[in-house]
């Protein structure tokens, strides 16, 4: 795998200054900030003793207001603003993730304990939605590989399946009229994708506790894939030898595949993927248009995972 070449850019240079300063102030009082954001429950201060990692991009980050108010999270509603408006009753603590299947050491793990166990990094990634819009987000989290190593996958395990929580009493989209999706929301990766150093379990963004509308308290971030692969509010991770289906693949297999790698050469049946709207930019309605990069700009790191594959057939 080619070595990662981080651009020479500091966090204070890519982040709007007022947000950067607020984040550093937050880090000095993480417990109070986390409790205020989560409401119920006591969040771990260790969650935000994050260190900046080599994983950065030489691009301006999306304003936190846009990151937290322009979301797809159908468990809370169909509109981009619904997750922020309708997730106030969702309780992200206490929270546990069950890891089972083809592993030597299955278990159910408290998220706060995982945050204390694994070093939390700050990673700034591009995020490309399949709907042809994008953001640049500074996440806080730990590699999924760290959790997988803890449970020791069997040699026969080839895939990793993920499952979102089902709480219709707190997630109005799960009991609303939009029932073309079967709950729980599910996703999957190949095991080598899941173990890749870029693949992250995020517990925060912009140095703060992960908001409900962004997938609290723990979500997946796979920056070279379309955003729907980033399953939110995870409650179960299963190692298997069978390729798992994902929710959108089941719902519309002609439009959504298992891999969902960002590919400007493979259009969605209803729109082009050659370019994207960068949310929070200076263009029309606050979005600027730019060419989409193969694998969302991470080709040097991940293209070898798909050597010899037909990327049009395996979309």
From Swiss-Prot:
Q: Does the keyword Metal-binding apply?
A: yes
Question: Which Gene Ontology CC terms are recorded?
Answer: periplasmic space
- What InterPro entries does this protein's entry cite? MsrP, OxRdtase_Mopterin-bd_dom, OxRdtase_Mopterin-bd_sf, TAT_signal
How this protein is processed and modified after translation, per its record?
Predicted to be exported by the Tat system. The position of the signal peptide cleavage has not been experimentally proven.
Give the molecular function GO annotations: metal ion binding; molybdopterin cofactor binding; oxidoreductase activity, acting on a sulfur group of donors, quinone or similar compound as acceptor
Which of UniProt's keywords are assigned here? Metal-binding, Molybdenum, Oxidoreductase, Periplasm, Signal
Top-level EC class, please? Answer: oxidoreductase
Q: What subcellular locations does the record give?
A: Periplasm
Per its UniProt record, what Gene3D superfamilies does this chain match? Oxidoreductase, molybdopterin-binding domain
The record lists the catalysed reaction(s) as: L-methionyl-[protein] + a quinone + H2O = L-methionyl-(S)-S-oxide-[protein] + a quinol; L-methionyl-[protein] + a quinone + H2O = L-methionyl-(R)-S-oxide-[protein] + a quinol
* EC number in record: 1.8.5.-
Summarize where Mo-molybdopterin binds, as residue positions: 71, 74-75, 129, 164, 214, 219, 230-232
Q: Which co-factors does it depend on? A: Mo-molybdopterin
One biological process term from GO is: protein repair
In Pfam terms, one family for this protein is Oxidored_molyb
Q: Paste the cofactor note.
A: Binds 1 Mo-molybdopterin (Mo-MPT) cofactor per subunit.
**Highest rank taxon of the organism:** Bacteria
Stretch forming the signal peptide: 1-45
What is the stated purpose of this protein?
A: Part of the MsrPQ system that repairs oxidized periplasmic proteins containing methionine sulfoxide residues (Met-O), using respiratory chain electrons. Thus protects these proteins from oxidative-stress damage caused by reactive species of oxygen and chlorine generated by the host defense mechanisms. MsrPQ is essential for the maintenance of envelope integrity under bleach stress, rescuing a wide series of structurally unrelated periplasmic proteins from methionine oxidation.
Q: How does it assemble?
A: Heterodimer of a catalytic subunit (MsrP) and a heme-binding subunit (MsrQ).
The UniProt entry's sequence similarity note says: Belongs to the MsrP family.
- What name is this protein filed under? Protein-methionine-sulfoxide reductase catalytic subunit MsrP
Organism per entry:
Rhizobium etli (strain ATCC 51251 / DSM 11541 / JCM 21823 / NBRC 15573 / CFN 42)
The taxonomic lineage of its organism, from the top, reads: Bacteria, Pseudomonadati, Pseudomonadota, Alphaproteobacteria, Hyphomicrobiales
